[in-house]
């Protein structure tokens, strides 16, 4: 075998000479066969320049009959014979180009021209494979690479130059275009249907707006411009002047009016209540009883205003801030049944008088004073014999004081870090905002807190000390904001929707925290929609369903927890019971709730006791079939009733107006004879002394 170094000395011209000998049937020198054998054994050691002539030489050997019978090339011993032959016989040996060879090499003859013809069955080396043309015209002209996505319709160069990308048509691109056009063709009918539906909806809305304008000729352009100049914007989150506000139900006002009508009380304060002094300094509540009341207050009410320890409310507060101290004792008195009603009544009158004076004090108010105002706004009906404090007015004025007193409200929510001091202020702020929302939606009154102030409410949850109750308050604030917005969009109520996208989004985040408030808001929305769809059976069924859910949930609460409920919970339960009386007076849940409320009430002045009687009386009158034309004067206010000229269908249910001509309830609620202030204080002192002897 010829040495590898000797093979490298063979030039291309020598091999080409041997090829010419083959073409003329001349004798081939021995070194040619040696070269071919070395190529079979050591192909990697040959350069590509020497391989090209060997390819042509191989083809010449297969054509020369003299060389076919030559046994000097022992292909059976060649390790690359499997890649070069198709059969094992020498006669049928056909040389193939190995896998490592370049199949696109052009074979040239001695003249330097590529060989273009073959003879017989000889497989000659193929020429350059013509690749499919995929580059666009621009890239081909520039002779650059065309960076094209296989599924794209333009290359990056054309996109960057913002010119048309002309691509050659290929089978794959043709199939993509065909599928795209087929999809577009299939979507055309659905698009046309949607357009027709939109046109129909626009026509209905236009006709509805025209009817509304015809029914309300008093609304002129000047009045609209006046509202615009008054500064009512979306930022204020106000609903004042909304047309649908006259259609919204007023559950708080309704329950208060029904209670007044059924009990026959005048709902006025005694004329001498303003001259009431400090009952604590007169010895009405001694230190031992006050300590017990403060401990009860911390256990059941302190979480609302960040009071976790009785030491947070010092005895010195009697002199420095008597309002918070008195409010704490008043709220805790419901947990001590032995305290005489006259004592509680005297405490309540003193607190009302102190509250009036505090609201007009010099600003800014102390933090303890704002805490007391927040508690009074949450529990305004501690005593039911007089007109309860208006929670909407009380919380509204307190919010204005809080804006002045709390510095963090004057900054963006992201500017400050929530520390312990800010947590205490945020709890008071959230309680005031929640009370304002509850009273606004419960009395169908406007809500004026600006959105930039409301954005501070959820910041309380960023602090590690945030509690489960803090999350419930934040969730309830957001829920009432959504309900208030929906309730006062007349077009949403006129559509009679049963599901609201805004509430569904709220459910995904907060539904696990609140149930009663959610059902209550849905109940209010359905009652509002019923003003425009009074014959809707689905609305009636939804009203009954939500009312039953509220009452069933309330019947599961524990007695200690029920006494600490804010007054809003009792309004929710009372309104749900009245709805059942209106549509299904024989529902057994009505009697169950009435009995449960009577069991919960610590005394006759508690809101649960009064609502229990109101529900019982309303059920009795609904079951006897009342005359809807005999209404109680002022039960809901003449300004709320719709005139016949409006021609808007609405229902005149028992929930809005109740029957009159009923006397007092001396058999159930004992009458307290009016006494002068000195006599009342003397009697209170005597009763308290007897209570101390028996209890303490």
Swiss-Prot record:
Q: Which SMART domains match?
A: GAL4
Query: What keywords appear on the UniProt entry?
Result: DNA-binding, Metal-binding, Nucleus, Transcription, Transcription regulation, Zinc
Main subcellular localization, coarse class? nucleus
Q: Which GO terms describe its molecular function?
A: DNA-binding transcription factor activity, RNA polymerase II-specific; transcription cis-regulatory region binding; zinc ion binding
Q: Extract the SUPFAM superfamilies matched here.
A: Zn2/Cys6 DNA-binding domain
Q: Which Pfam families match?
A: Zn_clus
Q: Which family does the similarity line name?
A: Belongs to the prtT family.
The protein here is known as Transcriptional activator of proteases prtT
